[in-house]
Structure formats: C-alpha cells, structure tokens
Amino acid sequence: MMRFLKWFFLTLREWFLKPATHRSAIIVANETLSRFIFSTRHFGRQPLRVKADAYMPSQGQVSVFRVDGLIAAQIWKIGDEIAEERDRTLYARGDIKAREVGRSGLDILPAEPPARHANIVGWPENDKPRQKLIALQLAAVATLVPKE
C-alpha cells in the first residue's frame, strides 16, 4: 500500500509540475520501456542477454524510454539521437515491461524532455549490493534487441 501511495504521489507531482508530451503521464503495467545500451559491457552476445550493469542506477535513477506504439525504426531513431548527443555508439537496447520494474520495488516517473523519457527511481540509497540485486532481477526479465 505504501509503495502505491508513493508512486501515486510522485506521479501526480510530475503530472502537475510539467506538461507531458507523451500520450499519458501515467505509466501502465504492460507498457514497454527501452533502455538504450551504449557499452559492450552491458550486454552479452552468447547468449543474447542484457547484463545487470545496464540497469545500475546513476545518481539514483536509470533512464528509459516509453516505446509503446512505435515501430522499431522510430525506437532506434530515439536511441540514435541520444547517442549523437552523448557522442557514443548505440549497440543495443533492453526492453522490459513496466510491471517488472514495479515488482522490483521501484517506480517509474515520466521525465520529459526528451519526449517519451522516464526514469526508474526508488533505488536503495548507499546500498550497492541491493542495487545490484535489483539490477540483476531487471536484466533477467529484459529482452535484448541488438542494433542491426
């Protein structure tokens, strides 16, 4: 119940503090979130999988994009724009359902701009082992989509 109230309050706060350019400020459980991967250390090729480091938080959050309703080319265009901004190479993405983030005890907050951007928040503070465990759980249910 407390997790729901926290999520509800944070979602309302985000909704009222800045306008959303995505179709909804509410993120539903079956919504797909893409984590763009800019490091070869964050995924494996044999077998194809997302590694936990791809989901380790930086400054208490993990950046993702809400990609429901987009075709693959549109998703990759978002990733390419981010890669260009950062002067990095885009190798792959990890796709995960929002429900899996919630099952791990984390929250997802829309964080636009850029359009469709959100952050996974609610990570244990100053507890790298717990953060790693949660990142492992997320990586285990994520689908790796290599860039062709």
Label for each model-derived stretch:
Residues 2-31, 41-48, 52-148:
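Conserved NAD+-utilizing ADP-ribose enzyme module
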